[in-house]
Structure formats: structure tokens, C-alpha cells
Amino acid sequence: FELLSNADFISDFYLAGGTGLALQIGHRQSIDFDFFIPYDFDTSQIIQSILSLGHFELQNEEKNTINGILNHVRISFLGYKYSVINPFIYHRKIKIAHELDIAAMKLSAISGRGNKKDFIDLYFILKKYSLDTILRCYETKYGKSLSNEYHLIKSLLYFEDAEEQAMPKMIEKIEWERVKADIVKKVKESRLL
């Protein structure tokens, strides 16, 4: 993290995902770094910059996508066309997405696949923000109304895929059954139902 925070190119990107959230609320350990940029970028130029930081093992390179391991830590750089809607949090040169931007991204992730860590992250975000507030951010970020609310409701209430996944390493202890029950409760209290 310190190596990246001193790299010149990093100021063009912002950190989001589980690590971006964990740095703000301290709920769980997350050891991978997902950096986003809202426009196309030159992957070969970024790879050259990363190589100057230490041992880098490239795992995948596609248009606007770099996945690899830098000094034993998984890192990703992704072109992500959706705008950031809240002010960044800063750590040196690293911009970190606001909790509500990450919350909207978590809703999007859950609607596509139900990973346990995403549900757990959402559970902790819901301790601070209402689901309706997160839904408004989701609509603003992705520029669409919740035209497919039915799919989103089903996704938020479908835990089966996550059941077999291991719990992430938690800093703030929580039981999986509690996470599910609280999310169900928040969905029932929201404008979705």
C-alpha cells in the first residue's frame, strides 16, 4: 500500500471494493487492492510503472484491465465508466471512494453474484446508512431508475451461493446468520417492498 501511495500514476485512480471500505470502517481484513478509473487507460504504461515498484506478476491484461500480484499482494486496475458521486477520502496520493459509492458498487455486485463478503460489507454499511439512501446513490451512480427492482430484491434476499463461502477475516466479529437476518429486515423496511 505504501509503495502504491507514493507512485505518481496512482493519483489518476481511486481505491474501492472491500479494501476501500475496510480502510474507512475497519470491519474486516481485506488484502487486495481494486483501483478504478472512470475512463480508458493505457495498460502497458501502467504495467511499466508497476514493474518499477517491485516484483510484479501479471495475471491478466485486457483493455482497461490489469490484474496481478505486486510483492505478494493482489492488485487490480480497472476502467470503470461510472462516475464517483461523493467526495473522495485521501491517503497520501491515493483517493478512496466514499462509503456510499462503495455501497452502490456492492449493490451492483450482489445483483450480479452473491458473494458472502459483499453481503457482509453491505451489512456494515447498513449500520450507518438506510437502504433507501444507498438505493438513491445506486440510481445516481448508474444513471438508471430501479426498473428491475424485482431482480434487486431477489438478489438481496438470495444467500444460497454465499452459504458455502468462507467468512472473511473479521475485525469486528459478526455471525453470518445475523448478517442475513439484518439484510432481510432492511429490505422489508425499504421502498423495495
Q: Predicted segments — roles?
A:
Residues 1-193:
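Compositionally biased terminal segments of proteins
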